């Protein structure tokens, strides 16, 4: 029969919280993509370059994360998964800023609701919020300890009413300044009362001279994703100037290593990307550039 001392020690051990998962691990354990959201429905499996982005978002020591992204890099799914983690693990006021109201409605209906509905850890996590007349509102939801608002940048007056700890902004280059101010700056001001705020901004650049995401990236540690050459092992960012092909035959495209000039075929790309690493070129704010050809 266990002694009182043994019982006490076991009780104290049971009170110790389990080690916190990295956000990338939590996403792969808890998030399920349903049919219609992904061509590969089922539990999320992150690409190697996505894992560090996720872990930066989940790192309490990092206030801002900026991603310069190509057209399709899985950022929306990553954003929704990170949002889900805050709902489940760190309840707080959350704001998602998108360019237009149509984007907001599409995001809620096509991504948030299906993913939350398909993921057992999130089922019924978001309740419908009611406006002053008692009607449910599509873009405002509450959950224990926090709330979620999805707001259009084209209506900056909506930002005045929300103080939030977590701010997600997608397609920032589609957000134009109004007579009042930049909607991005207005949204960031709504986080200033929270010392532990989190600001995540991502976009595909549109015009380099006026790009919101490139401006934010320039203020970050400017990380780039580098992969090893199968021939010489040197790390390089995969860039379009290093892609070559036979005249009139684009299907022969291959990558020429800038270090050893070896020409590497497409079949090596998955293993190269899997062995890749992010490298910071400046060490202040976490920022990732995924506009290369990975």
Predicted regions and their residues:
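Phosphate/NTP-binding elements of NTP-utilizing enzymes
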Residues: 2-294
């Amino acid at each position: 029969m266990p002694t009182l001392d043994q019982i006490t020690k076991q009780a104290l051990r049971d009170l110790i919280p389990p080690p916190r998962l990295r956000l990338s691990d939590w996403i792969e354990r808890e998030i399920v993509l349903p049919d219609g959201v992904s061509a590969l429905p089922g539990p999320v499996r992150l690409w190697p370059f996505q894992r560090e982005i996720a872990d930066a978002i989940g790192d309490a020591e990092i206030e801002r994360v900026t991603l310069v992204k190509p057209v399709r890099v899985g950022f929306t799914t990553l954003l929704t998964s990170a949002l889900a983690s805050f709902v489940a693990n760190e309840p707080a006021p959350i704001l998602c800023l998108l360019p237009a109201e149509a984007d907001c409605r599409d995001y809620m209906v096509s991504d948030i609701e299906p993913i939350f509905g398909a993921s057992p850890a999130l089922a019924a996590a978001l309740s419908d919020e009611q406006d002053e007349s008692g009607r449910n509102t599509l873009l405002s939801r509450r959950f224990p300890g926090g709330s979620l608002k999805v707001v259009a940048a084209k209506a900056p007056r909506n930002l005045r009413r929300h103080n939030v700890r977590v701010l997600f902004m997608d397609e920032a280059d589609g957000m134009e300044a109004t007579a009042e101010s930049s909607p991005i700056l207005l949204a960031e001001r709504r986080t200033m009362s929270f010392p532990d705020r989190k600001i995540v901004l991502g976009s595909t650049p549109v015009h380099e001279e006026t790009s919101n995401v490139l401006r934010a990236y320039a203020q970050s540690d400017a990380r780039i994703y580098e992969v090893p050459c199968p021939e010489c092992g040197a790390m390089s960012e995969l860039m379009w100037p290093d892609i070559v092909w036979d005249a009139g035959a684009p299907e022969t495209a291959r990558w020429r290593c800038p270090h050893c000039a070896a020409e590497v075929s497409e079949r090596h790309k998955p293993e190269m990307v899997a062995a890749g690493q992010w490298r910071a070129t400046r060490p202040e704010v976490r920022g990732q550039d995924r506009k290369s050809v990975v």
